[in-house]
């Protein structure tokens, strides 16, 4: 009966992914340069069954496998953490642990590719939807997490579901994006702290160059021949900022809006 329930949850999750529109993550900085991460999780047509989870040190978990059985890698929380899970408590979408390491997953269709599941690596296999929980349970820094990733195999639980990519932030303020492309794990430093969805993260950084003309505030008066030109109103420096909901456009908006946010002290 349990196997049937798990397979049903995986099916519902894969169905929801086909309707997913948007995940947008930003990172604000305090005056002390401490990171404050935030994000959205938006779904097109289906209410999201989300839940708040509090996981103590010593909590035992085991990864699900593609057949729906919970017989993958076992792990015990070395650090307690809190987070937001979807569909069931093991599937943590975003969270932070007691030593300040934060992690979240973002929809990444068409561009990611995990290695196929191998029964011989069953005890090393962690499902993509449980990777955030595994990271938060085990690591205090990004470097520790990178080393740990060499010891596991990330797997998908359903071939119909999209791949995802991840944002990991440590207390020092360092942040990386992790993607699995052509079965290889790659890490990118994330100086902006922004993440959306497809295509790959480096493409989004390159695309920012298309908007090098944008700036906060208003453009200055300009004389063209005998004609005097003035902006119609405030905010003209952001004329041309894309307004649609595609991942590239959301990345651009998040990057520029974030850059104009005030820097505040912690309290």
Protein language model regions, located:
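Short, basic/low-complexity N-terminal boundary segments at the transition from targeting/disordered tails
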Residues: 7, 68-81, 138-151
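Alpha/propeptide regions of enzymes that mature by internal proteolysis
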Residues: 121-153, 245-267
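Positively charged n-region of N-terminal signal peptides that target proteins for export
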Residues: 1-4
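Bacterial N-terminal signal peptides
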Residues: 7-15
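C-terminus-biased signal that marks the final domain/tail of proteins
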Residues: 21-36, 44-50, 157-162, 170-171, ...
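A contiguous strand-loop segment
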Residues: 22-120, 160
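Acidic/His-rich structured neighborhood in mature extracellular/periplasmic domains
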Residues: 94, 99-129, 142, 146-209
